[in-house]
Amino acid sequence: MQQLTEIVEQALVIIDQASDLKALDDIRVDYLGKKGKITDMMKMMGSLSPEEKPAFGQAVNDAKQAIQQKLTERIDGLKSSELEAKLIAEKIDVTLPGRTQENGGLHPVTRTIERIETFFGELGFSVKQGPEIEDDFHNFDALNISEHHPARADHDTFYFNPKLMLRTQTSGVQIRTMETEKPPLRIISPGRVYRNDYDQTHTPMFHQVEGLLVDEHVNFAELKGILHDFLRNFFEEDLQVRFRPSYFPFTEPSAEVDVMGKNGKWLEVLGCGMVHPNVLRSVGIDPEKYSGFAFGMGVERLTMLRYGVNDLRAFFENDLRFLKQFK
């Protein structure tokens, strides 16, 4: 009995000294497990007389309960302490000011595309999209761009192979639309385009919006009127606008469109012209019956002019100090 009493006293002291749940579990195994000290004491009953066994068995059972109760109390105490420490660590000071969530804003390029889509949408133009990886027919051939035209050169175009490339303009969307839909057509095609160029006013990827109208009896005067109205609407000013004769393989006649800047100088903003008969023929449209006009504009350039941005690369650098100005 003396040995049993010593085991219990020793266990209670060790339990009080345990600092974590792992240590308590080790103590439980050491004293109450299958090979524990209390279990070993139970095995001694085989050597006792029948008269001694009841008292010894009761003593062992009391010892086991005492150790188990002490373990339970200590486990509950440690869990309570851990919870209290966790609550203190995670305590929220409700007197502190709240953290407001900043509202995001549209990127200036996105804003410009939306303004363009809204204006032309009110004139009955629908928005069309197309693949950014284009074949040479839709990117060049159908647009009346000859095999030896400089635009096809490796230093201007990103080629995957001689017949497949990153599109250099969204005009391919116009070709695909004319292949699948019959006139009358009024579409604009905004999207990313790619050219091998990088400096203060050029990036390898930029955004373009091109427009196309095909119908009977379409003329250049209609084109001029629409673009005049668009530019005055976009810049929200009664701008001076001029059309300069130019050359594009896919339009004839062709023109560059300029606006008068605040410094008194003309600034080029877009290109346009009447759709070349060869372009209409390439998609199975009779140029004797139908005519059309097309125009194209660089979104970043328009955005730079509207907001007074000097370096096009700022649109792609994700500098919040810059982007927050357009919220």
Curated annotation (Swiss-Prot):
It comes from the Bacteria. Binds 2 magnesium ions per tetramer. Its cofactor is Mg(2+). Its EC number is 6.1.1.20. GO terms for molecular function: ATP binding; magnesium ion binding; phenylalanine-tRNA ligase activity; tRNA binding. Keywords: Aminoacyl-tRNA synthetase, ATP-binding, Cytoplasm, Ligase, Magnesium, Metal-binding, Nucleotide-binding, Protein biosynthesis. SUPFAM superfamilies: Class II aaRS and biotin synthetases, tRNA-binding arm. InterPro entries: aa-tRNA-synth_II, aa-tRNA-synth_II/BPL/LPL, Phe-tRNA-synth_IIc_asu, Phe-tRNA_ligase_II_N, Phe_tRNA_ligase_alpha1_bac, Phenylalanyl-tRNA_Synthase, tRNA-bd_arm. One of its GO terms (cellular component) is cytoplasm. One of its GO terms (biological process) is phenylalanyl-tRNA aminoacylation. It catalyses: tRNA(Phe) + L-phenylalanine + ATP = L-phenylalanyl-tRNA(Phe) + AMP + diphosphate + H(+). Tetramer of two alpha and two beta subunits. PANTHER family: PHENYLALANINE--TRNA LIGASE, MITOCHONDRIAL, PHENYLALANYL-TRNA SYNTHETASE. Belongs to the class-II aminoacyl-tRNA synthetase family. Phe-tRNA synthetase alpha subunit type 1 subfamily. This is Phenylalanine--tRNA ligase alpha subunit. It comes from Shewanella sp. (strain W3-18-1). The gene is pheS.
